[in-house]
Amino acid sequence: RPRFTEPEILRTSLGAVVLHMLSVGVARTAEDVTNFGFIDPPDMKAVSDGFNELTELKAIGRKRGEVTLTHTGRQLARIPIDVRLGRMVIEAAKAGSPNLLASVLVVVAFLSLQDPRERPDDKREEADRIHNRYADETSDFLTALNIWDRVFQADGDPSNNALRRICRTEYFSWLRMRQWKDLVSQLRQMCKELKFKVG
């Protein structure tokens, strides 16, 4: 096992980093990103992969040899999650269904965070049995929506104390459920700023 964890910039997709650098104007080319002055600079292939990802997502284009943000890229730069998940938000907004967008926000927030389900060693079978009540065998996305609907929608938004009780009995991490709820709220606010209609 390595003595130190590899720096995050060397082990994750650079799409979001490249997008941010382009949006604030500190980079226009892959060379600008590579030469930026990171403590642990990424290699050229990782930077190139980041640009390719943004091209596939239609977040960037080229004008007179320079990389520019598209309308989609400017929207993505304002969404505080992985660029691929952010693109899901934009596509859901384009579909024109406020309820669809609300569901997508719940799913992308779930995918952005650590799974809130807990399986303590001494109660693994009980936790699995309880979690199976939320499961949809056709889709993990629908499972996430089931958890959200039953915890945060069924009886109204629970107080912190009520959420703690739910988490204790349903084997959810209270902290991760709070993070999920907070990220959904943040994404809903961002959608309003982008003039997306959320149900």
Roles of regions detected by a PLM:
Residues 1-199:
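Second RecA-like catalytic domain
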